[in-house]
Amino acid sequence: PDFTLRQCFFGEHLLTDKTTTKTIAIVESEKTAIVATHFISDFVWLATGGMNGCFNKDAVEVLRGKEVVLVPDLGAADKWKSKLPLLQSICKQVLVSNILEDNATDEQKTKGLDIADFLLMTETPQMALQRLIKRHPPLQHLIDSLGLVLVEEP
């Protein structure tokens, strides 16, 4: 066939406006980029199309001179951090967000949730408790010492 296949970011067409000053947020799945755009419009949301997708020299060229934040799925942060040297050579600024890893429960980490999963989810009592324990670590000692259990409303 007479064509050349070129991998690109999902949402890359949104970068054609040269006047945009929004930071670019990159996620793994197309669904996540769409959901995040709805909830967090301060960023231009792009998707790689997979954990390893679009992290090559040609594909990332569209990010030249841009401020970029990578928002990997739970469990993928180290893999995405390995892409920093490539991106740092092209982007004005790039960082990997730890917001999911820092706030997820062990169960959520095991499931490998992404930011869309959190944006679409209603906070459960277990999630609220984990958030409080993260903020106030002595709370866990108190819970353990007194044998407290989480009681959910019927």
Where on the chain are the PLM-derived regions?
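Short, small/acidic-rich helices and loops at N termini and domain boundaries
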Residues: D106-V149
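Phosphate-handling DNA/RNA-contact segment within nucleic-acid enzymes
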Residues: P1-K66
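Acidic, metal-coordinating catalytic cores used for nucleic-acid/nucleotide bond scission
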Residues: K31, M51-F55, P72-K83
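Short, charged, surface-exposed secondary-structure boundary motifs
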Residues: G53-E61, K79-W80, A104-A116
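Structural alpha-beta junctions
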Residues: S41-W45, P85-N98
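Acidic beta-strand-to-loop metal/phosphate-binding motif
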Residues: I24-I26, L63-K79, N98
